Amino acid sequence: MDKLIIELTGCDRSGKSTLNSAIGEHYNREYGIGKQFAHICVIDRWLYDSIALDRYFNRVIPEVETARKQFLLDNKDRMTIIWTYASVPVLEARQKEQKGLDGSDYNKIVIDMQKMSDIYKELFDELGKDLDLQIFDTDACSPEEIVESLIEQGILD
């Protein structure tokens, strides 16, 4: 394993935090967003997500987006980006299931899952071939199966 940073990215309700928890369990640690282990830092949403979410919310500052992309490209040898996705109907069902459970204002916002999914796909088309970007369909595989795949690929140890 030679990566220092693992960024978990993807639409809302695509399984990023659940995967983060599974990675933590793999390392026998408590769950934590951005949990730092002795040799890697796992970040639940960071630069890749910032680019996608700025596009989604129409708040793109071109110079900032360019700088974020350049940072990702400059550090591609030290980073793995894990894109979790699910079909739009599954994302919408997960959103309905979650809505209001934690009482936060966030869950009162209805996210257009199709638009968000399209933005992530667009960003993948732009950057995917130049980055270490792993893609996992959380409809088809469990967090534990994803962790196992990451171990087999040498991304996790």
Regions found by a protein language model. Name each.
Residues 8:
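Hydrophobic anchor at the beta1->P-loop junction of P-loop NTPases
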Residues 11-14, 18-59:
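Conserved substrate/cofactor phosphate-moiety recognition/catalytic segment
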Residues 28-31, 41-42, 81-83, 130-135:
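Conserved beta-strand scaffold positions in the cores of enzyme catalytic domains, especially
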Residues 36-39, 89, 139-146:
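A short acidic, often aromatic-flanked loop/helix-cap motif at beta-alpha or helix-coil junctions
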Residues 57-65, 71-122:
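A glycine- and Lys/Arg-enriched "phosphate-lid" helix/loop adjacent to the NTP-binding pocket
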Residues 99-102, 109, 114-157:
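NTP-dependent small-molecule kinase module
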